[in-house]
């Protein structure tokens, strides 16, 4: 028999207050014409440099890699696409580990399948990598980064990862500061490989590394710095607009039980897409994510079951008239929630893209149903579901199935109905991304959640169903995360079912799980590492 929720105290979580308050309200600087002209002049110089570099040459490979890592490749999408296609179509023989690894990574990043057999020349008769390679630090680093583009059953790349990780850890501990640029690059890579790093974070860290590299191109470096600072101004202005919206709602006071994390939500979405053309989409998606966070905390950290039943019904009805059926304290949030989607409809109806909002609403309804399912389990005498049942629900309740669809709504590109239908059917790349976020979140957060009477996590369900220890459950989940990354890599191989820019949104969303959930739940506990990351991307400009 279900326990009476009326007799239960509210499951308050006592989240810490906002780190940022209304700090970004004052960031209203516009990008000047002089800044635009200077960036455009550098851009044309760099474009000419890229086009004139011989096709397939080491010079072109190194240049493209630097552009991508410095965060300016979005300016040269077509030129880079053509260059990588040419490299893939006419591969050149090379026995330089650095160049072979770099070419492999660039080609796979672009969605072309290049066989990992290209690394066989660096192995001995036993299939092990030759010990002589340990003298080539740059080559080891490039092979290490390439190994993160592996898919399932690529044993040579598994061997490559183990081999390079072992030797790079040993080498970096003994490297002198004379090689400081390379030492920093190796240390950073061992902590966070390129494939798993958010593009803005990679740009910020690589600008410093690249500047200290004696072989750097000073024009490209200057361009990257100017572009970073110009984009930062745009992002600050967007966050200023969003902060005004958030302040006007006054939800920090109306919903003190919820995590007040507007800036963190924006940073999350900035990870999904940072380019100027996605400004409208970023603001739309940040509002959706912020309201989702309030709804999530209402389910997890405040409302009773008797309050959540009509609230879930109201979301499923998606009707302003349903507002009278929900508790008074929920009504401002429900109205603001409806208003966000109405605003989307007003903007997109003028562009003939109203169908996008239909799919976004569907995903949000599905997400709230998943929240409610967890509430039902908890209300049913703390029912612990079977692991497989919990997994299917958790892949939805983590939000990583809602975001890929909703983040497309405000984008300028043509996106077909077929693409939205594809997303609705939970494709492998979206399931893999959802699994990564859910597993990482549960590993760092499940013990705290259990202390405040949260529904059993996937960790607890796995331990119960399979008689596993906590450490065994952690090991299983970490292995699942590794395999999910391999599935994401495979889904990028051409021909793809949907445009590459759609897959890139899912990839970047997955990358966002790293800073949010790698060591702790940094969204919930936002005072430490995440605060520093936000500071480096959204406050501190790069010194020219």
Swiss-Prot record:
Annotated Gene Ontology cellular component terms: cytoplasm
Chain residues that bind Mg(2+) 3: 449
Cofactor(s) needed by this chain: Mg(2+); Mn(2+)
List of residues binding Mg(2+) 2: 296, 300
UniProt remark on cofactor binding: Binds 3 Mg(2+) or Mn(2+) ions per subunit.
Keywords assigned by UniProt, alphabetized: Cytoplasm, Lyase, Magnesium, Manganese, Metal-binding
InterPro entries from the UniProt entry: Isoprenoid_synthase_dom_sf, Terpene_cyclase-like_1_C, Terpene_cyclase_plant_C1, Terpene_synth_N, Terpene_synth_N_sf, Terpene_synthase-like, Terpene_synthase_metal-bd, Terpenoid_cyclase/PrenylTrfase
Binding site residues for Mg(2+) 1: 296, 300
Compartments in which it is found: Cytoplasm
GO molecular function, one term: magnesium ion binding
Pfam families: Terpene_synth, Terpene_synth_C
Notes on the domains: The Asp-Asp-Xaa-Xaa-Asp/Glu (DDXXD/E) motif is important for the catalytic activity, presumably through binding to Mg(2+).
Family: Belongs to the terpene synthase family.
Protein name, as recorded: (E,E)-germacrene B synthase
Taxonomic placement: Eukaryota, Viridiplantae, Streptophyta, Embryophyta, Tracheophyta
Gene: SSTLH1
């Amino acid at each position: 028999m279900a326990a009476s929720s009326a007799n239960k105290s509210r499951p308050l979580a006592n989240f810490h207050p906002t780190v940022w308050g209304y700090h970004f309200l004052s960031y209203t600087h516009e990008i000047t014409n002089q800044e635009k002209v200077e960036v455009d002049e550098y851009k044309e110089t760099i474009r000419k440099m890229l086009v004139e570099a011989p096709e397939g040459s080491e010079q072109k490979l190194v240049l493209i890699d630097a552009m991508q890592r410095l965060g300016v490749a979005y300016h040269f999408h077509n030129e880079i696409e053509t260059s990588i296609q040419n490299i893939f179509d006419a591969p050149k023989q090379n026995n330089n580990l650095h160049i072979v690894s770099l070419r492999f990574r660039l080609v796979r990043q672009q969605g072309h399948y290049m066989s990992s057999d290209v690394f066989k020349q660096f192995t001995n008769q036993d299939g092990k990598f030759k010990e002589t390679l340990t003298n080539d630090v740059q080559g080891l680093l490039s092979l290490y980064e390439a190994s993160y583009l592996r898919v399932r059953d690529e044993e040579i790349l598994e061997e490559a990862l183990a081999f390079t990780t072992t030797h790079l850890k040993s080498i970096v501990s003994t490297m002198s500061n004379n090689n400081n640029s390379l030492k920093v690059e190796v240390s950073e890579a061992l902590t966070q490989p390129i494939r798993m790093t958010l593009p803005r974070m990679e740009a910020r860290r690589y600008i410093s590394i690249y500047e200290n590299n004696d072989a750097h191109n000073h024009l490209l470096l200057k361009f990257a710095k100017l572009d970073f600072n110009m984009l930062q101004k745009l992002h600050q202005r967007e966050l200023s607009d969003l902060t005004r919206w958030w302040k006007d709602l006054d939800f920090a006071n109306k919903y003190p039980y919820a995590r007040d994390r507007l800036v963190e939500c924006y940073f999350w979405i900035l990870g999904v897409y940072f380019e100027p053309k996605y400004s409208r989409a970023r603001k739309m998606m940040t509002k959706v994510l912020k309201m989702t966070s309030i709804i999530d905390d209402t389910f997890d950290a405040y409302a009773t079951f008797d309050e959540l039943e009509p609230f879930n019904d109201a979301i499923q009805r998606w009707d302003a008239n349903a507002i009278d059926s929900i508790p008074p304290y929920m009504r401002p949030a429900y109205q603001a929630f409806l208003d966000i989607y109405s605003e989307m409809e007003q903007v997109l109806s003028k562009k003939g893209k109203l169908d996008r909002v239909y799919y976004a609403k569907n995903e949000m309804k599905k997400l709230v149903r998943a929240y409610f399912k967890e509430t039902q389990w908890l209300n049913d005498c703390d029912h612990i579901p079977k692991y497989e049942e919990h997994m299917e629900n958790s892949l939805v309740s983590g939000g990583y199935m809602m975001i890929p669809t909703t983040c497309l709504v405000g984008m300028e590109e043509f996106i077909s109905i077929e693409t939205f239908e594809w997303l609705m059917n939970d494709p492998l790349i979206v399931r893999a991304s959802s699994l990564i976020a859910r597993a990482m979140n549960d590993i760092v957060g499940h013990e705290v959640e259990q202390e405040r009477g949260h529904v059993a996590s996937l960790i607890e369900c796995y331990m119960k169903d399979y008689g596993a220890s906590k450490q065994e459950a952690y090991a299983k989940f970490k292995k699942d995360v590794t395999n999910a990354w391999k599935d994401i890599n495979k889904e990028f191989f051409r021909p793809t079912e949907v445009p590459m820019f759609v897959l890139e949104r899912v990839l970047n969303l997955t990358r966002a799980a790293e800073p949010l959930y790698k060591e702790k739940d940094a969204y919930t506990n936002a005072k430490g590492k995440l605060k520093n990351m936000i500071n480096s991307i959204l406050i501190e400009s790069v010194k020219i």
